[in-house]
């Protein structure tokens, strides 16, 4: 199990982006959250199998999200196991 931290840049607040991300993550069986940041980005923290996390990352970059994603910067770590469900924050 791994942990992906993704900073999503672009027009991603107030457009249903966190809800959409939550729905995709739950479909993939991931746990974590999506949270608006004061600077306009959305922070996505997700844990699960690497292949499922990579699928979520591909979806975040797909151009089929609500709003408009300009850039996604990700970081990989070992899963901490401290998350349950997938929520919008």
Curated annotation (Swiss-Prot):
Residues 3-89 form the Acylphosphatase-like domain. It comes from the Bacteria. Keywords: Hydrolase. The keyword Phosphoprotein does not apply. It catalyses: an acyl phosphate + H2O = a carboxylate + phosphate + H(+). Pfam families: Acylphosphatase. The keyword Hydrolase applies. The active site is at 18, 36. Gene3D superfamilies: 3.30.70.100. InterPro entries: Acylphosphatase, Acylphosphatase-like_dom, Acylphosphatase-like_dom_sf, Acylphosphatase_CS. GO terms for molecular function: acylphosphatase activity. Transmembrane segments: none annotated. It is an enzyme of class 3 (hydrolase). Its EC number is 3.6.1.7. Belongs to the acylphosphatase family. This is Acylphosphatase. It comes from Rhodococcus jostii (strain RHA1). The gene is acyP.
């Amino acid at each position: 199990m791994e942990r992906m931290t993704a900073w999503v840049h672009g027009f991603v607040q107030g457009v249903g982006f966190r809800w959409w991300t939550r729905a995709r993550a739950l479909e993939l069986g991931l746990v974590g959250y999506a949270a608006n940041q004061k600077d306009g980005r959305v922070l996505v923290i997700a844990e699960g199998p690497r292949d499922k996390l990579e699928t979520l990352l591909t979806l975040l970059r797909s151009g089929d999200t609500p709003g408009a994603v300009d850039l996604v910067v990700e970081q990989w770590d070992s899963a901490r196991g401290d998350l349950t469900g997938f929520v919008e924050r």
